[in-house]
Amino acid sequence: MRLFGLILAGGEGRRMGGTDKASLTLGGRPLVTWVAERLGPQVEELAISANGDPARFAGLGLPVLRDEHPQGPLSGVLAGLRWAAAAGADALVTAPVDTPFVPGDLAPRLWLAGEGACAVAEAGGRVHPACGLWPVAVAEDLAAWLAAGEARVMGFAARHGAARAGFPDENAFLNLNAPEDLARAESLLRKDA
């Protein structure tokens, strides 16, 4: 099994005042670094899905994939699937840039839950579909889904009967969507220190 990884960093950060969430800092380090350090060791290759100037990620040494037609996170997933398929990967594991506490065993647990098919993360009674595993074989169906105007990640996951991989830590998928979420994450860091 060849798993590739993708950090979804294409959002506009509207609830963060239009700030690029990838460059927001937590514990003095950019969010993109947190996710790269957690997801990178779990996959064979890692890339970032982002629009705008790719130079802002130059220090990470990772490929930056652009959306063909920006329609939300699934556009990034499609770019990642095509990149992974071209390199001979079996599946793509995705995590948003604003989930700095993504588990160190995300990829293997998603693979086991879905037995190689689509799978999404679940913690604290909530499903986190952007933290998912997507076989490269679903790329063309995803392209058709987006072309039909569909854009919901959970809708596409349900279309493919995505399994759910349960995680015990409800903070593992804490999304930093607003300033108060960032403050909560800083508090969790201090508590764990």
From Swiss-Prot:
One of its GO terms (molecular function) is metal ion binding. One of its GO terms (cellular component) is cytoplasm. Signal peptide: none annotated. Keywords: Cytoplasm, GTP-binding, Magnesium, Metal-binding, Molybdenum cofactor biosynthesis, Nucleotide-binding, Transferase. SUPFAM superfamilies: Nucleotide-diphospho-sugar transferases. HAMAP family: MobA (MF_00316). PANTHER family: MOLYBDENUM COFACTOR GUANYLYLTRANSFERASE. This is Molybdenum cofactor guanylyltransferase. The gene is mobA.
